[in-house]
UniProtKB/Swiss-Prot annotation:
Gene Ontology molecular-function annotations: zinc ion binding
SUPFAM superfamilies per the UniProt record, alphabetical: CCCH zinc finger
The UniProt record lists the keyword Zinc-finger: yes
Pfam family membership, one: DFRP_C
Matching PROSITE patterns: ZF_C3H1
Residue intervals of every C3H1-type zinc finger in the record: 89-116, 167-197
Keyword Cell membrane: no
Source organism of this protein record: Caenorhabditis briggsae
Name under which the protein is recorded: Zinc finger CCCH domain-containing protein 15 homolog
GO biological process: cytoplasmic translation
Length: 374
């Protein structure tokens, strides 16, 4: 008789689950620590043939470590994927893996497997005539036909004219110029140049530049446009009058603030509170507080700042903030002081001065002679 077949793995696992369920009936839902340990022990005995739990955990940790190491090696040996811009056709680029003989995608590869694709996609230079002989080219590699061609061209005077070929310009404007384009005026024997001069702008590019200039606006127009977009009801238009009024308001506020701070500092010093006061404030209000502060501090020395007599200073007088339709207390004060000075000067001018009082030359001479005699 043939031997009995061993039970399948699926049937064996089902049997083990049945045994575990029978032995742990009513214990899985209990949250006690002892019950949970007992359930885990029963599951280990049935599933792992009574293998120790710590050995099972060690085996699982070893498998996980081996898997992680394999994953790290794969990441290190993973080739760099070739990238391409969105607006570039991948078939116009050579596959870097195919160039090294490593690409296994074959026809499914999105990059080109043609080694000459770079030459096919390269555009012909519009600013260099391909017919012109290079500067470093010599007659060492010329054959008999090339030599005869050069001699005949020199004898006939068939030199290239500096004028650009009209057929070349037409082909460039219509995007027909390329590696396989031939000039209708004799092909390579055309005496006109087949290259654009330096700085030349094509008509199609010129139109695009003009259209772009039309869309552009000057900085003045941009400023006016942004100003027009603002809500004029909530904002004040900036003029000379509004600026001067704002400046005077700020000066007045600054003066009031300085007076208030000065008053607060005076009250603070009177009350004997010097905390938070700078040395300059203490010296201005009461210099004795500084002089008598410490006898061992030494004498107080002050250095006078040097003033450059040739330095020009921008003076701001009452006329700087003056304009029609605006009251100015500073103007009134200065006008009153000016009138007072002028009245005093007029009174002094009208006074009778006895010039004999200042004629002391003779007396001075007598004094000098007396001193000499002594």
């Amino acid at each position: 008789m043939p031997p009995k077949q061993a039970p399948s793995k699926k049937a064996e696992n089902k049997r083990k689950e049945k045994v575990i369920e029978d032995k742990t009936f009513g214990l899985k839902n209990k949250k006690g620590n002892k019950n949970q340990k007992f359930v885990a022990q029963i599951e280990n005995q049935v599933r792992n043939n009574n293998t120790r739990m710590d050995l099972v955990r060690q085996q699982e940790a070893a498998k996980k470590k081996e898997k992680d190491e394999l994953l790290d090696i794969q990441n290190l040996l993973k080739p760099v994927e070739q990238k391409v811009a969105k607006d570039v056709d991948p078939k116009s680029l050579l596959c870097v893996f195919f160039k090294q003989g490593l690409c296994g995608k074959g026809a499914k590869c999105k990059f080109s497997h043609d080694l000459a694709v770079a030459q096919k996609t390269a555009k012909k230079n519009l600013y260099a005539d391909s017919r012109e002989v290079e500067k470093d080219e010599t007659n060492e590699n010329w054959d008999k036909e090339k030599l005869d061609e050069v001699v005949n061209k020199k004898n006939k005077g068939g030199h290239v004219i500096d004028i650009v070929c009209k057929y070349f310009l037409e082909a460039v404007e219509n995007n027909k110029y390329g590696w396989f384009w031939e000039c209708p005026n004799g092909g390579d024997k055309c005496q006109y140049r087949h290259c654009l001069p330096e700085g030349y702008v094509l008509k199609k590019d010129r139109k695009a530049m003009e259209a772009q200039k039309e869309d552009e606006i000057s900085i003045e127009e941009l400023v006016e446009k942004e100003r027009a977009a603002l809500n004029s009801k909530d904002l004040t238009k900036l003029t000379l009058q509004t600026f001067v009024a704002w400046k005077k308001k700020k000066l007045k506020e600054r003066k009031e603030k300085e007076e208030a701070d000065l008053k607060a500092k005076k009250e603070k010093i009177k009350s004997g509170k010097h905390n938070g006061m700078s040395g300059r404030d203490l010296f201005l209000f009461d210099a004795n507080l500084i002089n008598n502060d410490d006898d061992e501090a030494g004498d107080i020395e002050m250095e006078k700042e040097e003033v450059d007599e040739n330095e020009k200073v921008f003076e701001i007088d009452a006329n700087f903030f003056k304009f029609d339709g605006m009251d100015d207390e500073l103007t009134n004060q200065m006008s009153n002081s000016t009138a007072a000075v002028s009245s005093v000067a007029g009174a002094v001018a009208k006074m009778d001065i006895n010039e004999d009082l200042f004629d002391i030359d003779e007396d001075v001479g007598d004094l000098d002679s007396d001193s000499d005699e002594d």
